[in-house]
């Protein structure tokens, strides 16, 4: 799944709007499984995972096996892929670092040969590339890392008329925009930058309180939280009272006394 680029919008999950569809689906699943619960509780499916991951995924695999068709295969593939994605976080950070370093290496050059790009990457002693493998980052490893962003080498022509395997800076624009801090040369000419927009916290945006993971979430939204549409109104406060009249909270405000000329 690619990261959202500036200017792209993704429809948010709305608990109040989407909950009824999920509730209806849950009821249908419960009715379908209810008659088979004794058999399902005794099931011991073949798991592609081990330890805690297997414990987490086993109920879903059991339901998939019960459904039949291609669901057993799809469920097991999803379990393996999602576990691999979680374990790939560190590798993902490495790929992002590669994008940043490639941007530095390109500068304003429209093309770079693979040899020159590798020379610049491996010449940075503070980067991980000189020690990436036994001899540092090579062409095959560079190609594999960049393929995750749909960036591939090709025969490129240089200003002096020569040709060699290399990369075009324009092919990095999309990945730089999605995964790296914004910079002027991250965008093709004529494409303006998209200003970032602050977003409200999920609880404020959806009009819901955050769930503590223990208590049952309240189905009713908190009226004091903003629902993301109407302008929030200022909380009501008791008005100030004049001197000599009853104050707030049932407390009388003592009348003022004139101390001038007192004996």
Swiss-Prot record:
Spell out the Polar residues composition-biased ranges. Answer: 230-239, 253-263
- Record keywords, A-Z: Plasmid
What InterPro entries does its record include? DUF3631 (IPR022081)
Q: Where is this region: Disordered?
A: 183-263
Q: Which Pfam families match?
A: DUF3631
Leftover remarks: The given protein N-terminal is putative, as other possibilities exist in ORF1.
Q: What does this protein do?
A: Probably does not play a direct role in plasmid integration or excision.
Indicate what this protein is called per its UniProt record.
Uncharacterized 28.9 kDa protein in xis 5'region
Q: Which organism is it from?
A: Saccharopolyspora erythraea (Streptomyces erythraeus)
């Amino acid at each position: 799944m690619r990261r959202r680029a500036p200017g792209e919008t993704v429809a948010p999950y709305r608990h109040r709007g989407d909950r009824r569809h999920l509730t209806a689906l849950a009821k249908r699943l419960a009715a379908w499984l209810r008659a088979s619960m004794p058999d399902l509780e005794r099931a011991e499916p073949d798991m592609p995972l081990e330890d805690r991951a297997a414990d987490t995924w086993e109920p879903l695999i059991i339901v998939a096996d019960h459904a039949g068709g291609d669901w057993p295969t799809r469920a097991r593939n999803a379990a393996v892929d999602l576990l691999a994605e979680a374990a790939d976080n560190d590798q993902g950070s490495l790929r992002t670092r590669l994008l940043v370093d490639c941007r530095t290496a390109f500068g304003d050059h429209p093309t770079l040969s693979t040899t020159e790009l590798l020379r610049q990457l491996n010449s940075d002693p503070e980067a991980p590339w000189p020690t990436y493998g036994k001899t540092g980052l090579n062409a095959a490893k560079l190609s594999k890392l960049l393929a995750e962003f749909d960036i591939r080498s090709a025969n490129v022509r240089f200003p002096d008329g020569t040709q060699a395997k290399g990369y075009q800076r324009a092919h990095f624009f999309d990945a730089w925009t999605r995964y790296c801090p914004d910079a002027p040369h991250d965008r093709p000419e004529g494409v303006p930058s998209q200003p970032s927009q602050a977003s409200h916290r999920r609880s404020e945006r959806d009009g819901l309180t955050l769930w503590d993971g223990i208590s049952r979430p309240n189905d009713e939204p908190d009226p004091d939280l903003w629902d993301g549409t109407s302008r929030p109104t200022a909380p009501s406060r008791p008005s100030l009272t004049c001197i000599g009249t009853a104050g707030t909270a049932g407390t009388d405000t003592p009348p003022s006394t004139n101390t001038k000329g007192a004996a």
